[in-house]
Amino acid sequence: MKMNKHYSELKASYLFVDIAHKVAAYQEAHPEKEIIRLGIGDVTQPLAKCVVKAMHDAADEMGTKEGFHGYGPEQGYPFLKQAIQGYYAGRGTKIAEDEIFISDGAKSDLANVLGLFDVDNTVLVPDPVYPTYVDDNVTDGRKIIYSRTSQENGFLGMPDENVKADIIYICSPNNPTGAAYTRDQLKVWVDYARKNNAIILYDAAYECFISDGDLARSIFEIEGARECAIEICAFSKSAGFTGTRCGYTVVPHELEREGMNINKLWLRRQTTKFNGVPYVVQRAAAAVFTESGMAEIQSNLDYYRRNAKVIADALDECGVWYCGGKNSPYIWLRCPGNMKSWEFFDWLLENCGVVGTPGVGFGECGEGYFRLTAFGDAEKTKLAAERIKDAIKAL
């Protein structure tokens, strides 16, 4: 039989696996040292109480003849889709219920949606980039081109009219850089996509962290986006569902290519290859949009925002350049002393006992930069910030 040869084209290991191996080796050599992890973007605050109650209630339902649920609708239960619809409407964005598809998280849909598009399409991704965008397309054999970003453009790449792309990845606020596009900047991307008959895959996983009014929470706030964009979002960062797994994808009715309606194609794909998210999980997700749910998750988001400010304030005090941290849980900093990314990783671990993520692991344009996250414990984040500040000042 023949294997998919493109898997052999992937990098030898995943970035966070390399980090884990380095940290394990250091911990084994220095068992007495406390290591503070500000690397991988997993949340640490527990699920909201009303979310847990909704899960309990749904589990109890499943234990009764009257309340038992077997296979659900592949595209999601109406109660959750209507709650999401209301969430968009509350921000002035109109989305039809049948444009919303419930998933087990953004990462799955970011990969699965590619099945609708031919492997001959050219893909445009930013550099630095969330590695999954690249790996998903490498394994399909697509041509990938990079939109290079830098400190000079605030790590926000803009379209190059000399470049033709068919699939465009945008993540705003961005992972890993924390940078976020304004509405005017997103309009330029939408116009570019429409001109090139391209489709934007818009990763909105971090929209919940946006506080500035001039930043879009959804690509569909931008005129023309319904004709060229698919939005993918999740409850992982907004509601702490990294271990619970639930997300959603919005595919507008207007989105068509080569005479095929992509909303209908995605529905057909889901009914063929996906059996839906568990009823208990969808009930938990719906609780997020209740009055008490929104209040509780905002409390958790504020917790992470305070962590971000603690890190940012420490970097400000020692004169280190960074972006992100305000509308994002990620702080993307210039490595002090002209250190390379992995050099700074080793230095930070040795001198501060702090783990972050080397920027070069996200692409060539990340060399010399480093990502810290605000998802840690508050007290440990304060301790890490003090250690980092003192160590950098001593350089």
Predicted regions and their residues:
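Conserved glycine-rich beta-strand-loop-beta hairpin in the small C-terminal domain of fold type I
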Residues: 282, 286, 301-312, 322-335, ...
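Conserved core segment of the aminotransferase class I/II
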Residues: 222-302, 309, 313, 393
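Helix C-cap/helix->beta junction micro-motif
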Residues: 30, 140, 195-196, 318, ...
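Conserved core of the PLP fold type I
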Residues: 66-193, 207-222
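N-terminal small-domain helix-loop-helix segment of the aminotransferase-like
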Residues: 2-104, 112, 288-291, 394-395
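PLP-dependent enzyme catalytic core of the Aspartate aminotransferase-like
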Residues: 86, 94, 124, 338, ...
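Hydrophobic residues in well-ordered beta-strands that form the structural core
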Residues: 125, 146, 202, 356-358
